[in-house]
Amino acid sequence: MQHKLLINGELVSGEGEKQPVYNPATGDVLLEIAEASAEQVDAAVRAADAAFAEWGQTTPKVRAECLLKLADVIEENGQVFAELESRNCGKPLHSAFNDEIPAIVDVFRFFAGAARCLNGLAAGEYLEGHTSMIRRDPLGVVASIAPWNYPLMMAAWKLAPALAAGNCVVLKPSEITPLTALKLAELAKDIFPAGVINILFGRGKTVGDPLTGHPKVRMVSLTGSIATGEHIISHAASSIKRTHMELGGKAPVIVFDDADIEAVVEGVRTFGYYNAGQDCTAACRIYAQKGIYDTLVEKLGAAVATLKSGAPDDESTELGPLSSLAHLERVSKAVEEAKATGHIKVITGGEKRKGNGYYYAPTLLAGALQDDAIVQKEVFGPVVSVTPFDNEEQVVNWANDSQYGLASSVWTKDVGRAHRVSARLQYGCTWVNTHFMLVSEMPHGGQKLSGYGKDMSLYGLEDYTVVRHVMVKH
C-alpha cells in the first residue's frame, strides 16, 4: 500500500511519529504511517505557494486537461481505489466500486468543464473615460481537510474546484482513513506540475494545526465536525483566512399522512443507513404525521431488520462497520442514552454486533420527543428516530428547531404543500419524495452550524475564487 506523502512533486516518507491505520471490519492494524513533520508541512505549503506563480496563470483549458487526466486514471484504477476504501473504511466493496468511484470521476470531469465556463461580469463604462471589468481569480494556497466517512469522494470535492479555479492545494485526509488519498498522490504527481497538489498524513494537532495556521495559506476548506470547524475558524482568525465549512447535519424527514408509505420505507431503508449511517445528509430524524405513524413504524422496522451487516467483500453485505472503535462507542452511548429515557422504544437493533470489527446493528427508535438528544444531536451511525407530529405548522417548527441546517426531505402527494414546506425549511437542500440524491451540477452545503460555502456546482467553483475589479483609464 502506498504510504508516502506528496510534497513538491515527490513521494517522501513522513518524518513524524508513526500512527496505526486500522481495518474496521476486523480491528486489525493494516499498517503504520509516519506523520508529516512540522518542517514537511511548511515545505508543502511553500511548494504550493511557489507553484501558484505559474499554475494560477494557466488557461482554463490547461487546468481542465489535467483534471480530465486525473479522472481517467482514477477510473482506470477504480478497482484498486475501491478495495483500499473498503479495507480502510469498512465500506461494502460493491458500494465503493459501483456507487462512489463513478461519482468521484464525475466530480473531476464536471469541474474540468466548469473551469472553462467561469466568467466575470462584462466590461462596461461606469465612469466616463474609464472601463471596468470584474475578474474571478484564484486565491493562492488552499488547505483542505477531508473527513473519514467518504475519504476519496471528499478529497475530490475539495481538490477539483480548487484546482479548476487555479489554486494550489495541500490536502490532509483523515488520519483514520488516508489510504485512497495517498494512492491518489501517487497517480496525481505525474499529471500536475510539482507543488500544485501536495498530500500529507497526520493528526489534527500535529499536521492540521500548522497547516491551517500557516501564513501562506489563504483559504481553509473543511468537511468535519462542528468542534473541528470551531477550532479551525479560531485558529485561522489571526491571519484572516477564508474558510469553507461543511460541518455535519441531522436531516429531518417529514412524512405527511398522504405520503406513499412504501416509497418512504424503501427510501429510509436506503438513505438512512447507507455507509452505516455515517453521512451528514442521512435520513435519520423522521417526523411522521399521526395518521400514518404506527403504520410507518411497523413497516419501516420490518424493513430495517432485513438490512444485512457483514464482511465488506461479501456481495450481499449492505452495511459495513463503523469507522473506528471510538466511533462505535459514541454511537452505542447515544443509543443507550435514548433507551434510558423510558419513552423511546427500540423497534429493531439497538446494540453492537458480536464478534470482530466495529459493527453496530441497524437501529430504529420510535417515540422520540423533540427535545430528546437522539433528535437534536448527530449520531452519525445506523440509527434513525421517529417522532409523531400533528400538523404542518408544528412539524416545520420542529424541523427547524435544530442547530444543523444541511439537508432535509418532505414526503407528500400534495404539490402545494411540498412547495410551501420546502420554502420554509432552513436547510441547504430539501428533497421532495426522495432523499440523499446528489449531482455534480447542483450545490451542496448548509447553514446554521452545518457551516457555509458550497461544494459541487458552479457555486462551489466560485467559492475558490476572489472577485476583483480592474479599471482602465482611456
From Swiss-Prot:
Pathway: Amine and polyamine degradation; putrescine degradation; 4-aminobutanoate from 4-aminobutanal: step 1/1; Amino-acid degradation
GO biological process: L-lysine catabolic process; putrescine catabolic process
Catalysis performed (reactions): 4-aminobutanal + NAD(+) + H2O = 4-aminobutanoate + NADH + 2 H(+); 5-aminopentanal + NAD(+) + H2O = 5-aminopentanoate + NADH + 2 H(+)
Molecular function in Gene Ontology: aminobutyraldehyde dehydrogenase (NAD+) activity; NAD binding
List of residues binding NAD(+): A146, P147, W148, K172, P173, S174, E175, D209, S225, I226, A227, T228, C280
Keywords: NAD, Oxidoreductase
PROSITE patterns attached to this UniProt entry: ALDEHYDE_DEHYDR_GLU
Active-site residues (renumbered): E246, C280 (nucleophile)
Glycoprotein listed as a keyword: no
Additional note from the record: 4-aminobutanal can spontaneously cyclize to 1-pyrroline, and 5-aminopentanal to 1-piperideine.
Membership in a protein family: Belongs to the aldehyde dehydrogenase family. Gamma-aminobutyraldehyde dehydrogenase subfamily.
Function of the molecule: Catalyzes the oxidation 4-aminobutanal (gamma-aminobutyraldehyde) to 4-aminobutanoate (gamma-aminobutyrate or GABA). This is the second step in one of two pathways for putrescine degradation, where putrescine is converted into 4-aminobutanoate via 4-aminobutanal. Also functions as a 5-aminopentanal dehydrogenase in a a L-lysine degradation pathway to succinate that proceeds via cadaverine, glutarate and L-2-hydroxyglutarate.
Subunit and interaction comment: Homotetramer.
Protein name: Gamma-aminobutyraldehyde dehydrogenase
Gene that encodes the chain: patD
